């Protein structure tokens, strides 16, 4: 009996070993190493030395860009994720109503999502150029204000949000699948009871697709917490520094309005060679992502139980 239990235990560990190895190498070890180096003075070249909480004090109190980067990241999480979910659901509902040409419209709305982030951001920056871009030209022709977009601190984050909405095809596809899976009988019964479109959406559509909405929000929050490529490329294109990598570039252009936490990690770790402080920001970013995910799953599961 003991031998059989031991064999079963060995067999279980053997089957789990690929996952355990992957989890240890790609998650547990990097996480613990990041936490370890957040308490060390380390530039990537010399031996690390223990500094206690000095790195944390520097990032939270003396590093001039941390709080601005945190505010920008939270702004993007709240605004960008919310609008992407709303637009993705709205477009999904519109496309599912189309009687003919469904495949064509689905492809048209999904294709922008497949565009490489760097190329898409560069194209958007040129389109929204306040001096030569066609968008401001059209706005001027019809008598509307012409924003500075990526050159204006007040408009840079809304411009990044517009870029994210342009590539909302991924959410459209998953919402379409969820909407098409809602039982038609429920809609027919609601119509017979005299329920209008708003009532059908609130009491039939939304409860049925709530798991997909929760999935879209959670994954959107995690992805936006790691927002890096579009913000830095947009800043470089708008500042005119994209063509020459040797030119001095103002991080977070314009005036720090596009700083995000991942950019701070890059700035500290690879431009200032302050690996310890970069690890502090990485630990904070991980903690925020975990806290936001746990909160959303807890609140979301409450909505699911209620439905």
Q: Model-found features: residue ranges?
A:
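Juxtamembrane low-complexity tails/linkers enriched in Ser/Thr-Pro and polybasic
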Residues: 1-2
């Amino acid at each position: 009996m003991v031998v059989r239990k031991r064999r079963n235990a060995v067999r279980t560990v053997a089957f789990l070993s690929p996952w355990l190895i992957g989890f240890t190498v790609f998650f547990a070890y990097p996480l613990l190493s990041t936490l370890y180096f957040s308490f060390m003075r380390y530039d990537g070249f010399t031996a690390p030395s223990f500094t206690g909480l000095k790195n944390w004090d520097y990032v939270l109190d003396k590093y001039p860009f941390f709080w601005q980067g945190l505010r920008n990241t939270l702004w993007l999480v709240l605004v960008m994720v919310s609008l992407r979910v709303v637009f993705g659901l709205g477009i999904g509902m519109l496309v599912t109503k189309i009687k003919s040409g469904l495949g064509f419209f689905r492809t048209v709305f999904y294709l922008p999502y497949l565009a490489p982030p760097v190329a898409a951001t560069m194209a958007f920056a040129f389109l929204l150029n306040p001096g030569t871009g066609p968008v401001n030209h059209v706005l001027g022709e019809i008598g509307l204000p012409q924003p500075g977009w990526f050159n204006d601190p007040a408009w840079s984050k809304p411009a990044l949000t517009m870029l994210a909405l342009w590539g909302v095809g991924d959410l459209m596809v998953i919402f379409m699948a969820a909407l098409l899976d809602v039982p038609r009988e429920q809609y027919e019964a609601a119509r017979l009871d005299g329920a209008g479109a708003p009532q059908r959406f609130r009491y039939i559509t939304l409860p049925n697709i709530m798991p997909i909405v929760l999935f879209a929000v959670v994954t959107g929050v995690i992805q936006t917490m790691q927002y890096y490529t579009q913000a830095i490329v947009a800043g470089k294109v708008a500042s005119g520094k994209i063509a020459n990598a040797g030119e001095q570039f103002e991080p977070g252009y314009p005036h720090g309005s596009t700083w995000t936490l991942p950019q701070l990690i890059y700035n500290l770790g690879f431009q200032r060679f302050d690996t310890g402080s970069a690890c502090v920001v990485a630990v904070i970013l991980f903690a925020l992502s975990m806290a936001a995910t746990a909160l959303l799953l807890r609140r979301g599961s409450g909505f699911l139980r209620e439905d």
